Amino acid sequence: PKVADESVTAPKNVSAVTEEVVAPKSEKAEEPIADQTIRIHVKKLPEENKETQGLWTWDDVEKPSENWPTGAQSFKDAKTDDYGYYLDVKLKNEQAKKISFLINNVKGDNITGDKSIELLSPKMNEAWLDDKFKVYSYQPQAEGTVRVNYYRTDGNYDKKSLWYWGDVKNPSSAAWPDGTDFTATGKYGRYIDI
């Protein structure tokens, strides 16, 4: 396969943010992600029969796929969570920068087109494909929302807040300088969904 034309992107900018929302909660516990592994989440598979589809990988992976089209990592081995399916792919080494992949079927169709994930940091170990197979470095937010992450190396989030106004459904309403506190905790520190 050729080098992918589409790289991982952050969620699109939202010019008219609508309301504060609660982060999605996982109903199924995921297994921990092993070191030097990236977990690729897929919202839905392109075809109904997952046993005839696979994840074909190349570039900075431990074992690039071989023997087209049946050498892909089969989705029959995929696990499920509240987002959809996921497969874990071992990286070549700690300096891995780019994972290229596609979803194919045993007939040899490249169903999704070539995709790639640029590893934004050595700690990045997950990527998500939405229902149109667009790649994200972050679990896609609900339409019309934006997540603001705030990470402090000292872990002190007391009296740290965010002010938002303008095209939002519920602008900050406290008196200055008291904004909305960062109370939710996620993979990248504290966050607020707007």
What are these regions (language model features)?
Residues Q36-Q53, G144-K160:
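Short, surface-exposed binding/anchoring microloops in extracellular/periplasmic proteins
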Residues K2-P32:
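Intrinsically disordered, low-complexity repeat and linker tracts
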Residues E48-E94, V106-D114, N156-I194:
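Aromatic-rich carbohydrate-binding modules that target alpha-glucans
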Residues A4, H41-L45, W58, D88-K92, ...:
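A structural detector for beta-sheet-dominated domains
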Residues P11, E31, K115-A142:
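Extracellular beta-sheet/turn segments enriched in Thr/Pro/Gly and aliphatic residues
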Residues K97-F101:
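Exposed beta-strand face motif in extracellular beta-rich ectodomains
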